[in-house]
Every structure is written in structure tokens, then in C-alpha cells.
Amino acid sequence: MKDMVTPQRPLRAPQDVMRLARMGVMMPTRLSFLRVLTRRLCAERAQVQRTHWDMCADGFGTAVHQVTLGGRTYALISVSKPLDDSARSDRVIATAWDAAFVLFDGVPSAADIARVATQAPRQEAGRFGPRDLVLSRANKSMRLWSEIVAALRAGHQPAPARIGEIGYIMRTTAVYGNGKFGIADRHLVADRPELSGAFAAEMLAVYLIRQFSLDLVQHVGQGTLDRALSRHIGVGNATGLGMAPFLVTHPVLLNNWMVARETALARVRAVPDIPATTRARITTLATRVAGHLSQWHVPGPEDEAALRALEAEWAAFRHHLDDLPRQDPYEHVWSCAQDHSVALQELVVALLLEVNGDIIDGLAECMVDPFGAPPQPFAGTGALRDAIGRDWGWALDIDFDDPDACRRFWYVSADKLEPRLGDRFAEDGAELETPLDIARRVAQAHADLPRTDQPVSAFLRDFPQHKHAVDRIAICARHPYAEIRDNLIATTCRPIDMLRCKLSFFGATKFDPKSDLWTRITLAQGAPLGDELTDERDDWWLPVMSV
């Protein structure tokens, strides 16, 4: 039997997709990593089991939640400790947290639990081993935590509106994987199908942390939360600059994420017709989107205004979804979306993907980078110049003599080994700059190219400082979605847009920017609970709290 080729439209151009203005409004989709992970859990009808619970009445102690996936057992070892309110901080400089976690490979022994109970609260300063897959920590959201505990102790359920407003009772401030601080290197588990996907181990840890938080609040509250309320409680996350450089330092991985997403959209746009059941599903989801937007509020006035504008724009747009043409319905919707904001366009992308899992879910297997960037030497500097002209015209258009075009510099702090941003004209340390100034480097390399063709090796012998730029040009020539096509050292660069892009691939919702440098988000809100993992439960995109 011949392999089936799924029809598709042309992919959107990288110069349109890879702009921060668009990346900064991306939405979670069914290709997001947490969603992919929960689909696998549902497909295997996995059951989360609490196999250890040693907690005092106030909720301090240790716990273990286990799940079998792909024929292997994984266990979240949780350590809950008292924390003074004055010490509760989302900042990376914090040294204590309400809870610390390790995702453990296998069934932990009593000695393993005791070791993690000692080491996990120390986080970066702890000692870990090859069976420790993920290291994390979290703080309670005391507003909602206290309200739920008080309600349960009084014998009633907490207010649904408050759960909808806040959305989580614990907020992680770091989820470390891939060998960080001595935990297991990725290659130890990368060949396991259940953990082969992008950030699969980290997403499994987040999902189990959510279950732990629900068990803990019910233990302390001495009552049982309504299932619908429990389902709407996710895991919060506070994320800052530490996440932003990842998209630059992993260009092939970024390309693969984007290509999968763009290919999914291209496939959906090529669907010639759809049945009545799918039309009804689209109408249902359009209503859900409206409800989700109406329940998404943030304190920042500019961001809140943008959300309300998107809510109004969706209300004006959705009639296109209620009255789809018989032929090429998705292409019609996509064409109509082009007259609207990029925020609405990306919301439409997510909705179109949501109703077409049968033709796009397999693309999740393409969202990893097992090989890295292969060398691709140019025939000579003429070919190098051509590649710059084809892919990097936007960088050549930037006037780097303008101080505001190169004011920022990225560096890594000595105390926490975390990315930071500096002002090269007002602060010391620019000599320690991390090479995220890709556009400037490419422009400088272009300016030094010889007029006549010569081997690239000869060019780099004379100008060794351009080696990194040449490597990036070569990567982009083969992987067109590998580069953010904006100036990352300009005063106009908003790192929050980079965070939004990456977090949308994780599956984040309810983005709540606190500045241009950090944000809070929610993960797993609406996801099935640990004893509800069945195929019928894979329907929690943009959840709405029924108040």
C-alpha cells in the first residue's frame, strides 16, 4: 500500500511568522507539549496513584504520586515544608519554597524518598543522580489556597468565580530537566517513546504537581473538592528572562516546532469540506473561546485593554465560523482572518488545529531535534552573500549606528547563572555579552564580505569573529524558521514575546505579564484529573469555568 500524502496549502512565510509581534500573541494548541503528554496518558488509560503520604495536619511532609506510562513507572516525590510569608517569592534569588519536587525514574524506595526530602528543598545546591529526571519547586497562591481551605473546613465548596479568576493553588518557579544541577541527562530517556517528545518529562512532572496540589489542599481543608472545580485548578508558573534565550540557542529545535505548527495549519487549510458534526463542533468551540476570553483578566492596564480588544474582535469575527461555506471552509475562515489583528489570527490558528486532530496530531513526533545543526558549508562567499540576501534582508535594514538599535546586551549573572539584560551605554559588563545579537553579527559579517568570491574558510581566517554569524546563516538556509527575525538588542525588543511563544508550545494559558521581562501563566487548567485519563477527556483547550 502506498503511503498517503496529506494535502496542504503553502506554509506561511518565515518572515511573517518569525516576528516577535506575532510570536508574542501565540496561543496553545493541540500540538502543545502538555496536551500531547495528556493524550498519551489518556490513550494508555493511565492511573495516577498516591503510593506514599506522610503529611501532618498542616500539610507538611512527603508524598509520592506514581503513574505507569509506556510500560514504565514514574513517580513524583513531593516535599512540603513550612514557609514564612515574607520568604515566599517567585524571584530566582529565592532560597526557600513551599514545596520541592523530583520526578523519579521508577518506584522510589524509602531511602530514595528520604534522600529527596533532604536534597530537593536545596534545589541548585542539592545533590542528585541519574534516576532524578526533573527538579522543580513551587509556592502556594495564598489567596486561593486559604479560601479553599477555609471553605472545605466550613463544610462547603469554594466560590467557582475565585477559582476561575486565579486558576491555580501552586505556582512553580522552576522546572529543571535535561541534566541541570546533576539530574539525569536527556539521552538516558530520549529513546523511550513516552518521553521522546519535547519537554515530555517536564510536562509529566507538571501534571503530577497539579495532582499533588489538589490532594494537599483537600488534606489540609479536611474535605473534598467538587470534581468540576478540581478540574479547573491548574498549575501556575512564574517565568522570567531565564527562558527567553532558549529560542535563540536552540535554532533547529525552534524551527521544528514552528514547521510542525505551520504544516498543521497548511494541512487544515487544504481540507475541501467538513461534515455537519465538525461544523457544530466549531460553533461550540467559538463559544468556548468567547467564554475563555471573558474570564481572562490581568492587572496591567495595557495588557487588560489588549485582552478586551481581542474579546470584542472575536465577537465581531465569529459569524464567519457560524456560517461556513460548503467548499474549502477553513481556507475561507483563514482568508477572513487576514483582515484582523495578528492576535486574532493566531487564535484562529489554534481553533482550526483543535478540530483537526486526525490529520495533525502525528506532527508532534517531528517537534524534537535529535541531531542538532549539521554543517552546511557554502561553496564560497558568493553563496554566503546570496543566503544573507535571501534570508537576512531584515537584519541588513537595521541601522546599528543608532544607539537604541544596540543598547541592550544579554549576559549571564554570576550569582544565579541566569540570563539578564543590561544597558551597554549605562552599565558595565558588555564585554561579557552572550551572543544573542544575531542580526548585528550577520550585518557585520555581510559588511566584511569580499567583493570577489573566495572560500568561506579564507574569509573566516581573515575575520574569525564572524564564525558564529556564518553558522547561523547556514542553519537558517536549511531551517527557515530557525531565527527570530527581529533585533534582540534593540530597546524595542520585548523579551515577554519570546516567553509567550515558548510557553504557548508548553500549553500555557491565562498569560499575565508583570512587565516586559516576566509573566505568570497557568498550565493544565481544565485537564483531566489523575483518575479521569480516557480518550473522551481530551477536550480541554481554552477551558471555561461554569459560574
What residues fall within each predicted segment?
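Ampiphathic alpha-helical segments that act as solvent-exposed interaction surfaces
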Residues: R30-R40, A94-G167, V271, A524-W541, ...
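Charged, amphipathic alpha-helical stretches
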Residues: K2-T68
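An N-terminal assembly and electron-transfer interface module characteristic of large anaerobic redox
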Residues: E202, G236, W257, E313-H320, ...
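Intrinsically disordered, low-complexity segments enriched in Gly and acidic/Ser/Thr residues
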Residues: L307, P325-Q327, S335-K514
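Intrinsically disordered, low-complexity regulatory segments enriched in Ser/Thr/Pro
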Residues: G71-P130, I183-H187, G197-H250, L254-T263, ...
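Long, solvent-exposed non-transmembrane regions
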Residues: V5-V25, D58-F60, S78, D273, ...
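Short glycine-rich, low-complexity/disordered patches
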Residues: L31-R39, A43-F60, R127-I169, G179-L188, ...
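Long amphipathic alpha-helical coiled-coil/heptad-repeat bundle
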Residues: L254-I282, A290-H332, Q338
